[in-house]
Amino acid sequence: TAKFNVIYNGKNLGEVTIGVPGEHNVKNALAAITVGLETGVNIEDIAKSLKSFTGVYRRFEVKGEESGIIVIDDYAHHPTEVKATLEAARSINLGRIITVFQPHLYSRTQDFYKAFSDAFSETDILILDKIYPARELPIEGVTSDLIFKEFNKNYPKESYSFNEKSEIFSKLKEIVKDKDIVIFQGAGTITNYCDEYVSIVKNKY
């Protein structure tokens, strides 16, 4: 959740709570509040609606919480979205953030690998899966290692790059501990990885 005070036309209308964390969600809520107030909706009704809003499918969606480990599924597949998600995670948790990212499209990886490296600056541990190609054919020299190498060059943090789901799960089993947030990010099959990992956590942690 996130809490903030609303000041409208110089008047403090009080505190509002939204059911999702992150500065970007606060900004969206403020825009919605402004529209509501301008069209005559009272702040109490607006605040009640916002408090019950818990987000949309695959947008920082908490899929499981077991043994102090929070597992999140997130659709972010552009550097700006990735950064916003990780900042939201940082705002609600003092534990480690472990990001499992599946790059989407060879062309996007080629164009934005440097921006992706910077977007992951908030994560404590980065795990990269192979690129999800969707409709694209491979581009020579373009793999997840572009992001991996750029990240390692700029941020002295723990990071891994794997080609197989089994390798990812093996590494997670080795490193995940109490109070960690594990975020599965991407627009491809990574959401299936997340569901499978939730089952693993429930059964083995």
Report the location of each language-model feature.
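Glycine/Thr-rich phosphate-binding loops of Rossmann-like dinucleotide-binding domains
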Residues: 14, 107, 136, 192-193
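A glycine-rich beta-strand to alpha-helix segment
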Residues: 167-198
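Thr-Gly-centered strand-to-loop micro-motif
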Residues: 19, 72-73, 162-163, 184-185
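Nucleotide phosphate-binding/pyrophosphate-handling subdomain across enzymes
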Residues: 2-4, 8-125
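C-terminal helical cap/extension that packs against the catalytic core
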Residues: 117-178
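Short glycine-rich anion-binding loops that position phosphate/pyrophosphate groups of nucleotides
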Residues: 103-106, 131-134, 187-190
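Short amphipathic alpha-helical segments
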Residues: 84, 111-113, 139-140, 173, ...
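Short, flexible loop segments at boundaries between secondary-structure elements
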Residues: 128-131, 200-205
